[in-house]
Every structure is written in C-alpha cells, then in structure tokens.
Amino acid sequence: MKTRAEIYGNEAAALLRIVTMYPGLNMQQLLCFHPGKSETAKALLSHLERQGRIFQSDNGGYFPAGYSPKADQALIKAVWVLLDFIQQADYHAPAEFPVKLVFFADGELYEVAYVAHGQEALVCHALRGNKGGSRRIILVLSLIHI
C-alpha cells in the first residue's frame, strides 16, 4: 500500500519545479500545467506553502522560498504561450535574452522571445539568423512594435 507522500510526492516535486523555473506565475497558470488535476494542484500548492517551500506574493504570484517576490513579466507572458502547447510539450525551460523560454512540442523546437518597447532593434539583431532551425514566437505588447 502506498502512502500519501508516495502518491503525491512526484506531483508536488513537479509543481515545485515549475514554481522554481518560472517564479511569479499565478494560480491559474500553475493549474494549467496539471490539466484535469486542479484540485490536487491547489492542495499541493497549499501544502508547499505550509511547509515554507513556496510563498504567494501580494499580487498572487507564487515564488520559491528565499526568492524576492519580483516577477519577470516577460517570462510570465511567455509561459502563456507555452501553456497553449502544454499537452504536446515534451520539454520546456527558461532561456536567455532575447529568448524567454524554449520548448519541444510535436518534434519541433520553439523559442518564445519577448520584445519590449524600445528593444525592437536589439532583439531583431539578436535573433537574426536562425541557425538552429527552431520555430520562433515573438511576443509584443502592441502591433505598433511590429
């Protein structure tokens, strides 16, 4: 017979991993990583909070213990794109400027980049020449940035 810890241990570890990789995600985003298991995920978030392993900031974002509650808004926006592919995603991870995150879905590598106001030329230069053959998804705040 399995204990409760054995049953939920992997799910709790996966949830803690998501909070650590993408600090500042809100509950809705975290629940999307666990489709069909929202009640379990909510209970695990509460459990991780009580253990002192994560905390929820005043704006609703979840952070690992010891982190400053300052979220990377560009990364949070990029995670929404990832969540559109989450059922097909085999792997995902944060990335370095100008790409905010990368993921594999359906045998393709995707890079999600965020272009902030005033960084258009810099990001364009940094993304020039796609040698890796990845598919790029570019996030902009407004159509005037295109």
Regions found by a protein language model. Give the residues of each.
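Glycine-centered, phosphate/nucleic-acid-interacting loop/turn motifs that mediate DNA/RNA or nucleotide
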Residues: 52
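Short helix-capping/hinge SLiMs at alpha-helix to coil transitions
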Residues: 18-22
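Short alpha-helical segments that sit at the start of domains
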Residues: 1-14
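Short amphipathic alpha-helical interaction segments
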Residues: 36-47
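DNA-contacting interfaces and partner/effector-binding or oligomerization modules
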Residues: 118-119, 135-142
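Nucleic-acid-binding surface
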Residues: 55-128
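Short acidic, hydrophobic short linear motifs in intrinsically disordered regions
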Residues: 24-33
